[in-house]
Swiss-Prot record:
<feature type="binding site">
    <location>
        <position position="132"/>
    </location>
    <ligand>
        <name>(2S)-2-hydroxy-3-oxobutyl phosphate</name>
    </ligand>
</feature>
<dbReference type="GO" id="GO:0005829">
    <property type="term" value="C:cytosol"/>
</dbReference>
<feature type="binding site">
    <location>
        <begin position="85"/>
        <end position="87"/>
    </location>
    <ligand>
        <name>5-amino-6-(D-ribitylamino)uracil</name>
    </ligand>
</feature>
<dbReference type="GO" id="GO:0009349">
    <property type="term" value="C:riboflavin synthase complex"/>
</dbReference>
<dbReference type="GO" id="GO:0009231">
    <property type="term" value="P:riboflavin biosynthetic process"/>
</dbReference>
<feature type="active site" description="Proton donor">
    <location>
        <position position="93"/>
    </location>
</feature>
<keyword id="KW-0686">Riboflavin biosynthesis</keyword>
<comment type="similarity">
    <text>Belongs to the DMRL synthase family.</text>
</comment>
<feature type="binding site">
    <location>
        <position position="23"/>
    </location>
    <ligand>
        <name>5-amino-6-(D-ribitylamino)uracil</name>
    </ligand>
</feature>
<feature type="binding site">
    <location>
        <begin position="90"/>
        <end position="91"/>
    </location>
    <ligand>
        <name>(2S)-2-hydroxy-3-oxobutyl phosphate</name>
    </ligand>
</feature>
<comment type="function">
    <text>Catalyzes the formation of 6,7-dimethyl-8-ribityllumazine by condensation of 5-amino-6-(D-ribitylamino)uracil with 3,4-dihydroxy-2-butanone 4-phosphate. This is the penultimate step in the biosynthesis of riboflavin.</text>
</comment>
<comment type="pathway">
    <text>Cofactor biosynthesis; riboflavin biosynthesis; riboflavin from 2-hydroxy-3-oxobutyl phosphate and 5-amino-6-(D-ribitylamino)uracil: step 1/2.</text>
</comment>
<protein>
    <recommendedName>
        <fullName>6,7-dimethyl-8-ribityllumazine synthase</fullName>
        <ecNumber>2.5.1.78</ecNumber>
    </recommendedName>
</protein>
<dbReference type="GO" id="GO:0000906">
    <property type="term" value="F:6,7-dimethyl-8-ribityllumazine synthase activity"/>
</dbReference>
<feature type="binding site">
    <location>
        <begin position="61"/>
        <end position="63"/>
    </location>
    <ligand>
        <name>5-amino-6-(D-ribitylamino)uracil</name>
    </ligand>
</feature>
<keyword id="KW-0808">Transferase</keyword>
<dbReference type="InterPro" id="IPR002180">
    <property type="entry name" value="LS/RS"/>
</dbReference>
Length: 158
């Protein structure tokens, strides 16, 4: 029996793309910071001159799939992280954005055979989003760990 797993020890060889929504940037900037901190601590070069990590800003979470798709056509990535924050309001807009963003990201990932980490916070309140972006825990760190694990796993499988 062969067991394949992702590794956290050889992360420094990964090429990572990040697509991030500007809407709710009070939250998304914090998530990005946590994400970059984790990548750096695992050996990736996150400096502005880095060829290892690319960041693309989009208006909102609805635009994440097309940006991820276009980014992957431009360069080869081991993994892409899609970051956003959608906070429930009084209309059905929340449900539409989350549904389409998640479906689109999954479709782009499968079409390109590249893992895309779904790092879009979906919360009922701003307070919940703030808690997940750093007051209690920064989920950006978790999304980066998922990216490292999946990126290395797919490299091992190929």
């Amino acid at each position: 029996m062969t067991i394949f797993e992702g590794s956290f020890t050889n992360a420094s060889t990964l090429k990572v793309g990040i697509v991030i929504a500007r809407f709710n940037d009070l939250i998304t900037n914090k998530i990005l910071s946590g994400c970059l901190d984790c990548l750096k601590k695992h050996g990736l070069d996150t400096s502005e001159l880095s060829n290892q990590v690319d960041i693309v800003w989009v208006p909102g979470s609805f635009e994440l799939p097309i940006a991820a798709k276009t980014l992957m056509k431009k360069k080869s990535y081991d993994v892409v992280i899609a970051l956003g924050a959608v906070i429930r309001g009084e209309t059905s807009h929340y449900d539409v954005v989350i549904s389409e963003a998640s479906k689109g990201i999954s479709q782009v990932s499968n079409e390109n055979n590249v893992p895309i980490i779904f790092g879009v916070l979906t919360t009922d309140t701003l307070q919940q989003a703030l808690e997940r972006a750093g007051i209690k825990n920064n989920l950006g760190w978790n999304y980066a760990l998922q990216a490292i694990e999946m990126g290395s796993l797919i490299k091992n499988l190929n």
